[in-house]
């Protein structure tokens, strides 16, 4: 096989009159009055190849037998297209190849879908034939970008003196939030390894070991309910440092992300990134990962409406809740009564009992609850919300967390529905000053807001033993366009603080030792102050590539039900394998 001289997509006017050898796939073949045209595709793009009997009758005869997705080698000469033949849609559109030889390296069955961008095909079929789906230029470009992003992270961290150190995939199951993927041990029947949800504890032990600056581009595994921006296995840019403040860790993170965006998108991002406390984010946006590319901020109107004779508002306030509103400027005409009823159903999915609304018309409030607002109170409400003619006012009244969840989700929906979001903008945001614990309604207790190794604010450490719900954390999340792309914190590095943390989480001293004894031992051997962050590589690429689903950024992903249609994983194993592992399936659910 002759060595390739160029990739198809690299050819341009500077190559005119050069002889080239190209390898690739037949994207399209056209027979036009004795001439055959082939669009030849490789990972860098497409170039047109012309087969003319005046140049090679033999090549023309072979070209007549090729079909889409045949793999071929073509030798020929780069030629300038005529002015009327230029194809502005192709990067190579000003040139073509005059074919001298063609060799068919392999044939292809007719693919189950066209290998081209914009093809209308189900996700299930795309994943079943993922190797064909990945041939499409738009998919190919995503993985070029992923390579660029990964390379840029590596180069930056290397330049900053970080060591790339691998941590094991077969480790101990510890309670970190989601369910573990378990791997049975053949050598120790009845015992299991766990695939890591993150390298959290191990990277902290690397700080105890004195490596000072660690990073790893690492695969993580979580057996949790899936959604569009989650997969059971995913990749993190994981880093940890000793003796640095959280501000310095944030600065390093900003520098990395600025370099990544510049390399991947050619866009310059200013620093420092804006910062917002967790409380402010929840108050203003109803979300701990707010999209700050548009307004529609939540406004607390409890003081304004506490005296109005509307029982929904009164009851919420009397029971310790609140009333908040969104002013959708100039949007009243966009929503009929039916549309507003649909919004009420939408917020009910987030726990809200309903959605009250008002429109401002000719200076007056109009709508089902307008009668509860006498003139003076109506003026007060309009002033509080800066409401003008044409505005749509939307209200939720309930416990603070339900109001935040429902209006926060509604805000995001309205931002999209009203076309308020600049899709080309990249809006980074730090969310800081997190509570150390959050209440889990299902479990009926407080759990770690991040993980059990997060350092409490120094002044709050005594509260671990008395009122843990009030403890604040040295934690920081980074958000991009409404997605959490990373979470970090300073870590607990003293044994007595870690013991208090475990007690606050409901561990007995015995259970803490059983689960985390190796970490507790390490904390007795001079562990330095340390902290770090983990960034979601798949999610970062998803946003930069303008996609809506993590599946598009992972070469061989799972479906929303954690199934791989390509390999049919997960699958059954033989009785012999189960016997080797001393395992027995006690119940099999039939679908």
Swiss-Prot record:
This is Aspartate--tRNA ligase. It comes from the Bacteria. Its EC number is 6.1.1.12. PANTHER family: ASPARTATE--TRNA LIGASE, MITOCHONDRIAL, ASPARTYL/LYSYL-TRNA SYNTHETASE. It comes from Listeria welshimeri serovar 6b (strain ATCC 35897 / DSM 20650 / CCUG 15529 / CIP 8149 / NCTC 11857 / SLCC 5334 / V8). Keywords: Aminoacyl-tRNA synthetase, ATP-binding, Cytoplasm, Ligase, Nucleotide-binding, Protein biosynthesis. GO terms for biological process: aspartyl-tRNA aminoacylation. It catalyses: tRNA(Asp) + L-aspartate + ATP = L-aspartyl-tRNA(Asp) + AMP + diphosphate. Belongs to the class-II aminoacyl-tRNA synthetase family. Type 1 subfamily. Catalyzes the attachment of L-aspartate to tRNA(Asp) in a two-step reaction: L-aspartate is first activated by ATP to form Asp-AMP and then transferred to the acceptor end of tRNA(Asp). L-aspartate binds at residues 176, 222, 450, 491. It is found in: Cytoplasm. Residues 200-203 are annotated as: Aspartate. Homodimer.
């Amino acid at each position: 096989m002759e060595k390739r001289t160029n990739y198809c997509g690299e050819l341009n006017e500077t190559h005119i009159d050069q002889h080239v050898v190209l390898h690739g796939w037949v994207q399209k073949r056209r027979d036009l009055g004795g001439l055959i045209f082939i669009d030849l595709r490789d990972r860098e793009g497409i170039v047109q190849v012309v087969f003319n009997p005046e140049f090679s009758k033999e090549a023309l005869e072979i070209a007549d037998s090729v079909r889409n997705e045949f793999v071929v080698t073509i030798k020929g000469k780069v030629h300038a297209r005529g002015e009327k033949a230029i194809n502005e849609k192709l990067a190579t559109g000003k040139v073509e190849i005059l074919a001298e030889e063609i060799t068919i390296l392999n044939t292809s069955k007719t693919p189950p879908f066209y290998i081209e961008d914009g093809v209308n095909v189900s996700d299930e079929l795309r994943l079943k034939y993922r190797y064909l789906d990945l041939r499409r230029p738009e998919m190919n470009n995503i993985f070029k970008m992923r390579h660029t992003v990964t390379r840029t992270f590596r180069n930056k961290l290397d330049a900053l003196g970080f060591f790339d150190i691998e941590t094991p995939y077969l480790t101990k199951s510890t309670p970190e939030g989601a369910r573990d993927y378990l791997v049975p041990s053949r050598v120790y029947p009845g015992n299991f390894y766990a695939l890591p949800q993150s390298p959290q504890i191990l990277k902290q032990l690397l700080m105890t070991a004195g490596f000072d600056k660690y990073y790893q581009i690492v695969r993580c595994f979580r057996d949790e309910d899936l959604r569009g921006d989650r997969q059971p296995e995913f990749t993190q840019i994981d880093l940890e440092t000793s003796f640095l403040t959280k501000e310095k860790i944030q600065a390093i993170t900003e520098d990395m992300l600025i370099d990544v965006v510049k390399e991947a998108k050619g866009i310059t991002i200013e620093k420092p990134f804006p910062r917002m406390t967790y409380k402010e984010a929840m108050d203003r946006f109803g979300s701990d990962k707010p999209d700050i590319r548009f307004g529609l901020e939540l406004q607390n109107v409890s003081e304004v409406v506490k005296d109005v004779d509307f029982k929904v508002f009164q009851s919420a306030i009397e029971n310790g809740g609140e009333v908040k509103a969104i002013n959708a400027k100039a949007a009243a005409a966009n929503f009929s009564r039916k549309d507003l009823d649909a919004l009420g159903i939408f917020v009910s999915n987030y726990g809200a009992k309903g959605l009250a609304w008002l429109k401002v018309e000719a200076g007056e409030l109009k709508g089902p609850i307008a009668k509860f607002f006498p003139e003076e109170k109506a003026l007060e409400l309009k002033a509080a919300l800066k409401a003008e003619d044409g505005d749509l006012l939307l209200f939720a009244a309930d416990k603070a967390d339900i109001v935040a969840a429902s209006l926060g989700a509604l805000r995001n929906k309205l931002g999209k529905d009203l076309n308020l979001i600049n899709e080309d903008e990249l809006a980074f945001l730090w969310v800081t000053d997190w509570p150390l614990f959050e209440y889990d309604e299902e479990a009926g207790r407080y759990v770690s807001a991040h993980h059990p190794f997060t350092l409490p604010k120094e002044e709050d450490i005594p509260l671990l033993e008395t009122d843990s719900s009030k403890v604040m954390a040295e934690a920081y999340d980074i958000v991009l366009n409404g997605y959490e792309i990373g979470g970090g914190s300073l870590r607990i590095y003293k044994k007595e603080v870690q013991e208090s943390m475990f007690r606050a989480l409901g561990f007995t001293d015995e259970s803490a030792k059983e689960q985390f004894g190796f970490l507790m031992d390490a904390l007795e051997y001079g562990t330095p102050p340390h902290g770090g962050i983990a960034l979601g590589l798949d999610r970062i690429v998803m946003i930069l590539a303008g996609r809506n689903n993590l599946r598009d950024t992972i070469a061989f992903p799972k479906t929303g039900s954690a199934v791989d249609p390509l390999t049919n994983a997960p699958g059954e194993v033989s009785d012999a394998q189960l016997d080797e592992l001393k395992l027995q399936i006690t119940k099999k659910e039939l679908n």
